[in-house]
Every structure is written in structure tokens, then in C-alpha cells.
A protein has these predicted regions:
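Alpha-helical protein-protein interaction modules
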Residues: 1-106
Length: 106
């Protein structure tokens, strides 16, 4: 398949769509599928963390956030907010989820 190497992007994109719609469990599952397919997709792990918080899986979100911070120690909530051009309400929920999971704010 010519686009097989891009499937992680599709999975994470589907996760983002579910996150935008407030379907956090589905968002976490799809985004995690993308991360599993391409572990270097740190941006996908941001969705996994925030979606897990909003789905009520805070312990899992904290574990994933710690793992993400080991891979990307300079990541903060404010860095994540500046990285994407999503709607303000999406970004607010993302930032809230990341902060709740223990990501530094600045």
C-alpha cells in the first residue's frame, strides 16, 4: 500500500475528530492506535493524554504524560497550545487535559 506509512496520521486525525466532538474514549483509542503505529508521533500522545483525562482515566493520562515528558522534556501546556491551529475550545480542552495530567503549564 503506498500510503501505509501515513496511517498513523489518519488514526491520530480520527482521534482529533473524536476529541473535537467530545467523544473522549474514542479519541484516546484512535490516537493511541496512531502512536502505536508510529511511536515518534509525540503530538498524537498529547491527544491521548488529554482525551484520557476527559474520559475519566486520569491515572492512565498521568502515566502517558510522564512517558511523553521523558521523550519530550521541553513540552509544556503553552508549547502544545502554540503548536496547533485548532479552534479555541478544542485547544482549551486539550490544555486543560494536559495540565490535569501533570504537564507543566509554562
Amino acid at each position: 500500500m503506498p500510503f501505509e506509512s501515513l496511517r498513523h496520521t489518519a488514526f491520530i486525525g480520527i482521534g482529533c475528530a473524536h476529541f473535537a466532538a467530545g467523544r473522549y474514549e474514542r479519541a484516546a483509542l484512535w490516537a493511541q492506535s496512531g502512536v502505536d503505529a508510529f511511536p515518534a508521533s509525540f503530538w498524537g500522545e498529547r491527544i491521548v493524554v488529554a482525551a484520557a483525562v476527559h474520559a475519566g482515566a486520569r491515572a492512565e493520562a498521568r502515566r502517558t504524560a510522564r512517558k511523553l515528558l521523558r521523550k519530550d522534556p521541553d513540552l509544556t501546556v503553552s508549547v502544545a497550545r502554540r503548536a496547533w491551529p485548532f479552534r479555541p475550545d478544542f485547544m482549551e480542552r486539550l490544555a486543560d487535559g494536559l495540565a490535569t495530567a501533570g504537564m507543566p503549564r509554562a
